[in-house]
Amino acid sequence: MKKIYFIAGEMSGDFIGGHVIQNLKSNEGLEFTGIGGKYMEEAGNFKSLFTITAINLIGFIEIIPHLLKIKKLIDKTVEHIINSKADLLITIDSPGFTYRVAKRVRKLLPNLKMIHIVAPSVWAYKADRAVNYAKIYDCLFALLPFEPPYFTKVGLDCRYIGHPIMEQEFYRDKIALRKELKIDENERILCVTLGTRKGEILRHLPIFIDAIQEISKDYKNLTIIFPLAHPDHEAIIKPFLDNIQFNYLFLSNERLKAYAVSDLALAKSGTNTLEISASGTPMVVAYKVNIISFIIIMLLIKIKYVSLINIIAGSEIIPEFIQFNCKANLISNKLKELLSNSQKRYNQVVKSKKILQKLGFESNRSPSYIAAKIIKQEFL
């Protein structure tokens, strides 16, 4: 019986891990253990060592109060890996946690095979991470086609598998979705994404609500959809919706329906922006972090944009309002501009689709199948 130890530190990594496990399950004699979420637990006989929300943290300053707790979780994870006598360690994204675990494990178990899924964005900042990963991992699976050369040139075996959004089926029939969700055909629908972490939600919510309130003055037929990453998030958002002037509804675990049915989206920067683009919905992106974290990020990064669509295009296809520009009046003005101009909305969708095609979207590529095939043939 071969044992694979997985570590996923956030929902996007859990999604990838779940699909990889699903593709590995066809091989009898494999056992899965480690840290993950609902997708990994549903995919196989997998029970997480602890909930991934414990390590789902972001930012440089925001993470400081949790450092002692994270160190204890790293210690616990390393001990669990050693005791599990795993044949292969697979870490997924969440470099702040997974890299530290892998580095410790490499010293203690120098012969253990180790794979990391989701290449760190060395093309954006901290290029030296490529060398650091080469010292620890046996193989790296990249989601973007241009990433492997950054790592192979420093001696790390890096394979392009494709982006996990390719694993999903996106909704196309907006009329049918409106009927299913009982939304009148005359309503204008704005999808609002706030993030998967409580801190992100609380940071963006007041700004986003103020922006929506401003739009609702001009659009009386406005309905807001809040797709929830977790049902508990409704209780976080609800107190901010007292005395509001617009209609709203929550959709739990139905984010792709929320993206597809909407006329426009106001999105917190992240993987969700790719999913919204793949759903054929135009958007405005906004993002804000702690000011000290932002200063550190600005000193490190080499790119102008935060949305992957814009980064690859080298231009602002999707309007971005980051940090000091993440203001309700600026956001609402741009949303109004797009709501009132169908041609601008259409142009964004068309340009975004071309970028998605560069990423392999609509190519029938299955990243998890490719990853599982490499794992089975070369590492077990």
From Swiss-Prot:
Entry's Gene Ontology BP terms: lipid A biosynthetic process
Pfam families in UniProt: LpxB
One function term, GO molecular function aspect: phospholipid binding
Xref: SUPFAM superfamilies: UDP-Glycosyltransferase/glycogen phosphorylase
Top-level division of the source organism's lineage: Bacteria
Entry keyword Methyltransferase: no
Keywords: Glycosyltransferase, Lipid A biosynthesis, Lipid biosynthesis, Lipid metabolism, Transferase
Pathway where this protein functions: Bacterial outer membrane biogenesis; LPS lipid A biosynthesis
Transmembrane segments: none
Reaction catalyzed: a lipid X + a UDP-2-N,3-O-bis[(3R)-3-hydroxyacyl]-alpha-D-glucosamine = a lipid A disaccharide + UDP + H(+)
Entry GO terms, CC: membrane
Lipid metabolism as UniProt keyword: yes
EC number: 2.4.1.182
Family recorded in the similarity comment: Belongs to the LpxB family.
Function summary: Condensation of UDP-2,3-diacylglucosamine and 2,3-diacylglucosamine-1-phosphate to form lipid A disaccharide, a precursor of lipid A, a phosphorylated glycolipid that anchors the lipopolysaccharide to the outer membrane of the cell.
Protein name, per record: Lipid-A-disaccharide synthase
Organism of origin: Rickettsia prowazekii (strain Madrid E)
